[in-house]
Amino acid sequence: SDLRQMLATKSVENIQFLPFLTTDVNNLSWLGYGCLKQDWTLITVNTVGAALQTLFVLVYLYYSPAKRPVLLRSLLLLAVLVAGYCYFTLLIPDAGTRLGHLGLFCSVFTISMYLSPLADLAKIVRSKSTRCLSFPLTVTTFLASTSWTLYGLQLHDPYIMVPNMPGIITSVLRFWLFWRYPPGPDRPHRPLHA
């Protein structure tokens, strides 16, 4: 719905960028983990996720009036991703050790992705409005983090299970913020479209 809003209004007003950028890097990192582990669920989901998040980042950059900060953040996280790729492929020859290090790297990025929408927490409390938060993204985050936690539990993979638990917690916190500080009549909650 945020992408649809940007295309309709040709504006990025009241839409956060950082959650989508960190999600894109997160998808690309987990795609590498899935390839190394040969887990087709991780590969498929994160390939689709990375493609969609990259589309969002490009549309956001196109409609953003302040392109320089958006581009700098994107390039910074891309540099981190490239440095991580070089580290994991060139400096760690053992596949088991590489899988453990990459799992830890992905876990840290997943936690940062789930915490990034809370960057505006002080602004939300001060303004008593959740206009800058996306309700559909909150619902999706809750469902995704719950699903991945259960998937990690089923596989006995702590790298998948543990970092997704903060997603559940931060989603519940954002649901509370939406209840406590409604976004107002200019941006009501829209239902998720299938």
Regions found by a protein language model. Name each.
Residues 1-194:
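Alpha-helical membrane-protein topology signature
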